[in-house]
Amino acid sequence: YPGKNLGGMGDGGLVTTNDDGLAATVRQLRAYGESKKYHHVMKGTNARLDTMQAAILGVKLPRLEASNAMRRKNAHAYDAGLKGIPNVVAPKVPADDRSHIYHLYVIRTTKREELQHFLHEKGIQSGIHYPIPIHRQPAYAELASSASRLPVTDGTADQILSLPMFPELTQAQ
């Protein structure tokens, strides 16, 4: 997906593993379940990365860590700017050795619509990613009975707002 931290010009994906069996299964699944040419041992799909995508991603991969560092810098600027603002909760980052890469910078606010309108008036784009929780989707109707047991999920879905996040975002923006 082009908007991801390591996005090509279309859809594509990557699986990394140190499990040889899992790697073999993934290779089969991406090629219609083939174990060898014309021998399909499982149901799969056509999920091979084409050479154009591979070439683009090959150029972008060496720059990924620098790009993620720029995203982290922008996130820290957001953190500082949003600190102490009532009704705004910034993303929480683990205090251990893990490092957030900020594909999105999603805040929570009980005044989402007002804030989104304010940002729009200032020419600042924002987005609401995943506004309908999975247990509220028709495809997962069997989960509907558990809806009353997911108040945090429902509340969060009504409060999330994604602020602009990309490596080239400047402090002035």
Annotate each predicted stretch with a short phrase.
Residues 2-8, 16, 162, 166:
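Active-site phosphate-binding strand-loop segment of PLP-dependent enzymes
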Residues 18-173:
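PLP-dependent aminotransferase class I/II
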Residues 1-9, 36-41:
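Conserved active-site segment immediately N-terminal to the catalytic lysine
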Residues 8-12, 57:
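Adenylate-forming
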Residues 4, 13, 30-33:
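Short, well-ordered alpha-helical segments in soluble proteins
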